[in-house]
């Protein structure tokens, strides 16, 4: 049993995990520059996932800025991350006003800045960066204060690169840090990240392309 478990773990680490860490992304998208490195001090690149959307960046952007548990949802598995409430299937004007410093709730009904991402970077039609910093009890911390001995931190980024033919390359990536460092080696969020983010990319692509086709 232990031998089989060890082989399974080795196979995951050697074959499966590397694929999940760069799902759909090119070598340049994985290794090249990505916005937000300065937001997570001493952080390292996290998983990078990418997809091509048959619509220009200005038609993808409205779907990104309306994300959130208290807004349009996360376009993922709604029973798991949106309380069973369906994510938005159209662009909502009331959720388009997003600015640096705003909080985007994880779940509907969470209070204040607790259980929320903070908008750290925002360049319309180009990049949205959501920042999270918590202690090990998942209580939000002030990024303007010195980091404690133990914490988790991450930047969740959505980069839109314009392609010829009115298309967009959506590259989801970012940076992460876990302290103490040994704690980070005990956890592997990659399968969970892949399951949820792969769904987000698929639904975003479908929604944006359907909306673009409806306008033609």
Model-assigned labels for residue ranges:
Residues 97-159:
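A contiguous catalytic/ligand-binding core that recognizes phosphate-bearing ligands
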Residues 1-2:
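Membrane-penetrating hydrophobic segments
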Residues 23, 29-30, 132, 138-198, ...:
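Beta-strand/loop substructures that line and gate deep hydrophobic ligand-binding cavities in soluble
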Residues 6-107, 207, 214-216:
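Hydrophobic ligand-binding cavity/cleft-lining segments
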Residues 10, 46-52, 127, 153-155, ...:
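Intrinsic-disorder/low-complexity, polar/charged segments enriched in Ser/Thr/Lys/Arg/Asp/Glu/Gln
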Residues 54-58, 119-128, 159-169, 206-212:
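A short, structured loop/turn motif at beta-sheet edges
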């Amino acid at each position: 049993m232990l031998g089989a478990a060890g082989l399974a773990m080795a196979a995951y680490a050697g074959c499966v995990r590397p694929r999940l860490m760069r799902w759909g992304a090119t070598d340049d998208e994985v290794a090249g520059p990505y916005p937000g490195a300065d937001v997570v001090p001493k952080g390292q690149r996290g998983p990078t996932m990418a997809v091509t959307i048959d619509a220009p960046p200005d038609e993808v952007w409205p779907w990104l800025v309306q994300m959130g548990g208290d807004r349009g949802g996360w376009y993922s598995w709604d029973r798991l991350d949106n309380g069973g409430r369906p994510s938005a299937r159209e662009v909502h004007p009331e959720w388009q006003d997003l600015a640096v410093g705003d909080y985007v709730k994880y779940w509907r009904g969470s209070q204040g800045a607790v259980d929320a991402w903070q908008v750290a970077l925002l360049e319309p039609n180009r990049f949205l960066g959501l920042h999270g910093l918590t202690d090990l009890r998942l209580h939000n911390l002030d990024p303007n204060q010195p980091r404690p001995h133990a914490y988790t931190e991450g930047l969740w980024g959505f980069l839109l690169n314009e392609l010829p033919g009115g298309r967009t390359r959506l590259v989801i990536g970012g940076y992460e840090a876990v302290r103490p460092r040994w704690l980070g080696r005990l956890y592997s969020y990659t399968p969970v990240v892949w399951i949820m983010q792969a769904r987000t990319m698929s639904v975003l692509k479908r929604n944006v392309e359907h909306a673009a086709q409806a306008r033609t």
